[in-house]
């Protein structure tokens, strides 16, 4: 399947969508195909999905009921220049990605408004029985990782399967608090 599409003038779109397969998903993913009936075939699919499945956005609404949903975020949040940082196996497994690690990996490439995608060679499909076990060797994020993104005015951050974003509350909460609260919401008056 082609995932890169040329737009002209040197611009391209790269589709990062992970396919959803109800047979292999570990979280709620049910697709019910049916024909509405009548003389003309009219097929539809009823979907019963959890919001944290496949390619998804951690939107402000996920963090606070009073904050914007994905539908309220500007589409431009998810479009633009992107930097892919693949640490491969250059960092020890289960290491928190530090500001120094990101500085070294990006070496001045990051610009204000960029999208940052972080990955490593320690891949593991998320949300499986192996998540957060000894088999899970992925790199980790925390408040320091998030603060680096905010300090460098990253507008959107994404992760490959080589980075764990839900290893423990002590890391997850600060990461979400800093990125979601500071990147997507306005301070209260």
Model-identified regions with their sequence ranges:
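Divalent metal-coordination and catalytic microenvironments
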Residues: 16, 56, 85, 116, ...
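Histidine-centered catalytic micro-motifs
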Residues: 47-64, 161
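Generic N-terminal segment detector
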Residues: 1-40
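Histidine/acidic-residue-rich catalytic or RNA/ligand-binding cores of hydrolases
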Residues: 167-177
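Glycine- and Gly-Pro-enriched alpha-helical subdomains that act as flexible
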Residues: 87-129
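Conserved small/polar residues in nucleotide/adenosyl-binding loops
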Residues: 184-189
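A glycine-rich, hydrophobic loop/mini-helix early in the fold
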Residues: 59-98
């Amino acid at each position: 399947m082609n995932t890169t599409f040329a737009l002209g003038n040197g611009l391209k779109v790269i589709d990062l969508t992970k396919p959803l397969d109800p047979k292999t998903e570990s979280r709620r993913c049910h697709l019910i195909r049916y024909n509405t009936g009548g003389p003309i075939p009219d097929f539809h699919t009823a979907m019963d999905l959890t919001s944290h499945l496949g390619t998804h956005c951690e939107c402000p609404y996920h963090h606070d009921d009073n904050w914007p949903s994905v539908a309220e975020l500007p589409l431009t949040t998810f479009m633009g220049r992107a930097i892919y940082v693949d640490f491969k196996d250059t960092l020890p497994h289960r290491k928190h990605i530090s500001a120094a690690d990101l500085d070294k990996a990006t070496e001045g490439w990051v610009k204000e408004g960029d999208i940052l995608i972080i990955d490593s060679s320690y891949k593991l499909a998320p949300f499986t029985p192996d998540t957060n076990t000894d088999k899970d060797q992925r790199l980790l994020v925390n408040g320091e990782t998030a603060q680096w993104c905010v300090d460098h005015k990253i507008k959107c951050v994404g992760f490959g399967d080589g980075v764990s974003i839900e290893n423990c509350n002590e890391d997850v909460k600060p990461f979400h608090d800093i990125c979601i609260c500071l990147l997507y919401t306005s301070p209260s008056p």
